[in-house]
Each structure stands twice: as C-alpha cells, then as structure tokens.
Amino acid sequence: MNELRFSRRTLLAGIPLSAAAAPRTVMVRAKRKPSDPSWTEYPTRTVESLDGFKPRQTAADRYGGRLDRKARATGFFYPIERDRRWWLVDPEGHLFIKAGVCSTSPGRSKNNKEALARKFGTVERWAAETVKLLRSHAFNGTGGWSDVASLRQAPARLPYTVSMNFLSTFGRELKLTFQQPGHTGYRGDAIPVFHSAFPAFCETYAAKMVDAPRDPFLLGYFSDNELPAPRDWLDKHLNLDPSDEATLPSRRAAENWLSARKGAKAGLADVNDEDRDAFRGFVYERYLTLTTGALRKADPNHLCLGPRLHGSALRSPAVFRAAGKYLDVIAVNIYGQWSPAADMLEMWRAEAKRPFLVTEFYAKGHDSGFPNTTGAGWLVPTQKDRALFYQNFVLGCLESKLCVGWHWFKYMDNDPEDLTTDPSNRDSNKGMVRIDYTPYQDLLDGMKELNANLYALTDWMDRG
C-alpha cells in the first residue's frame, strides 16, 4: 500500500469535490473478478488521508440521528433535502444517515447452527450480542434479509428494513420464475406487471405482509430484489412467444405501447435506443405505481424503497424518472465500481430528484482462505484492504450529497458446505464475521473509523 497524490480529476474521475476534499490516496490492489490474471491498483481515499479533516464523534439519539441537527419529528423516518444535501430524519426529528449491514441473521447451515449454540446458546442471545457488535463499530442499522423477528426482540434495537417479494411471489404462482445468481429470473425477462391479476395480488400481498405499521425503528420496505431491466427489453417483449399465456400480457403491452408511440404499423425494425429506454421506464412505472400504491395503503408510515435497482437499470434515465416519481428513497445495489461513478450519480440527480440508499456493495479478502469464486464484489488481498475499499466507496457516496445511507453485504461469510443457498452465495468472504461468528477485526476497525466520524465527515464536505 503506497501513498500517492493525485489531482482532483484523477481521484474521482469527474465527481465534483467540495473545497474541503483532499487529493491524497493510498493504492489498493484489487480484482473485479477472481479469474482476472493479475491485480490492478486503484487510488483509494481513506479517512486518514483527508487533508484537514479532524475526527470528531457526534452525539446521537437512540436511532443514530445526530442530536445537533433538528427537523420536524413525525415518529417515523422520512427524507429531507437541506442545504443541498439529502438526509433521513429519524422518528425523534434528528438528521440521520444510515450505516447498515445486510443479512444480519444467524447462519442456516449445520456448521452455523453448531457455532451459534457454542458461542451464544440461543438466538435471543445472538441477537443481543450482534446489536452490541454493530453498535460498538458505529453501525446504526441492518439491511435486507436480516432476522427481523429476532432483532425486534433484542434489548437494544437498530433501525431496519423489510424485504418483500411482490413480483417473485406472483411470478412463481404463474410458473414464470427460476433461480439466477443473486436474484430471481423470469422467463423471457418478462416481469408480469401487465398480467390482469397483478393489481389485486399487490393489494392482498401488501396487506398480508405488513406486520409493524407503527414501529418507529422500521425504515421502510424493499418491494423486490434486482428485477431485470436489460437495454433490449422492448425487443425481448416483442419477441415473446405469443402462445405462452403467462407472458402474452407482456407482449401485448409492448405492442400496444409501440403502436401508441410510433404508429399502428410500427415493428421491431422501427425501434431505436431512445424507444428502448422509454419502454424500460414504462414497465417500471407500471410496477412502481402498483407496488407503492399497495404498500402505502397497508402502511402509510414507512418508506417505499423500491426493488433494489442494479446492473443496467442504474444507467437508465427512464427507470430513474419512474423511480423518482414513486419512491421515497431509491435503493441501489452497486457492483463493479471502486467509487460510485460521477456521470451515473449526476444522471440520478437530474432524472430522479430523490436520494439513494446503497443496499449492496462489498469486497472479498483473499487472505480469508475462501475460493471467492461466487458473488459480484471485488477481490482484495487482505481484510485491511476490505476496510479501505469500504472507506473509499462510502466517502464517494457521502460526497454526492444524494446518499442517505448504505448497507454492506453482508454480516456473515458463505459456508462452502451449504449448497442450499443461491448460487451467488456459496464460497466467498463477504461477511464481517466468519461462519463461526468470529469477527474480522481488521475489517471492523476500519469500518468503525469511518462510521464513528460519519456526521463530522458530512460537515467537513459541506463547508465552504
């Protein structure tokens, strides 16, 4: 790890920097894929490298909101833009940015269960000790797929989210779905939002799944995970099998949309890239109006966070226009970016005009002894390098002034012996604890260095 100095342009590839930002970095070796033949060095900013920044902890309330910045209290979380920076406001009315962890749950494998019994004895004790672990490293929340039921009963609580599965559940009923690495796949990439039964399903599903509409610690809901939005989605819809009754509503919706846009005789040969992106927005608008409408009817108090946009959807202006229209905060899973890309963030700002919450990002450590062949996160040599990646990525998020939080993926490593998991979670060092619940202390120490200075860093970035 070597310390170097770079110009502001080199540092963030065009991300606008505040006057306070420092042009100092360290170099961290990484691979985007474990199969890459060699390591590449990436300029990496850390808390320690920020010229002029002085670490300072800020007093916080029980939710993690800063006591020195106040807004209107509603008893629940909500977003607010103040002085050109987006924040969450916690139930007591204090400005809040969420530092959370995905999949904060006991492991389900035989090895995990035996380790939990040895270390904690009971799931209740695990929940209490895990909240202590997170809080002691300045995390103030949990993310998707966490053990909500157990963590709700812990003596001390953390803000949390709830993961729902509107489309994957409905699609499964239609026999349209299959497992892909990391998320549900749909036949022909056609999500069945145009099916005549989907609106009623959304209403019933939301009413059934909402179980804590008055809980102030609940931040909000993810409606699904990583829905498809390929650039050629319109082409795929127009080519769907007309004899397939489950996907026929999607094909007809695409045909009708194209006819309304370009004339009754328009076909695939008349489609251009502007049409393709507009169609993505059309599909997402249909999905979002139904799911957010059903959620807000069942629970008007908590935030709609959306389906955790990922992949090519992150570059779609039309998808982000639709997301900004219907979501309170836009959940995004970001992979393949050492820092959040400047042009992408500016597009989100222009099109959505809403804040974002990073709901997955991570790096795996080569020193863990895992093969690390599964999952989309970066590969770095050591646990200390994982912490440096965390600091660099989060600093880029904070500097955007659009980010109201992040969820590291994830709490626990994959157990290579557990073959019941989804194929993207088989053999990799994604956790902050090992499969026997032993913490990766070098990683956690580096995370704490940033988390503990979270509000001081935003103040430093916003000055001048």
Where are these regions (language model features)?
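Aromatic-rich peripheral "rim/lid" segments of glycoside hydrolase catalytic domains that contact
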Residues: 409-464
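Polysaccharide-binding and catalytic clefts of secreted carbohydrate-active enzymes
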Residues: 83, 91, 185-193, 204, ...
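N-terminal secretory signal peptides and thylakoid transit peptides that target proteins
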Residues: 2-17
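Glycoside hydrolase catalytic-domain groove-lining segments
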Residues: 282-289, 301-307, 311-375
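Aromatic- and acidic-residue-enriched segments that line the glycan-binding/catalytic groove
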Residues: 154-181, 223-264, 418-430
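Active-site-adjacent substrate/metal-binding segments within catalytic domains
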Residues: 37-156, 169-214, 274-282
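Loop/turn elements at helix/coil->beta-strand transitions in domains of secreted/extracellular proteins
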Residues: 94, 137-141, 156-159, 214-220, ...
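Substrate-binding cleft of secreted/luminal carbohydrate-active enzymes
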Residues: 378-423
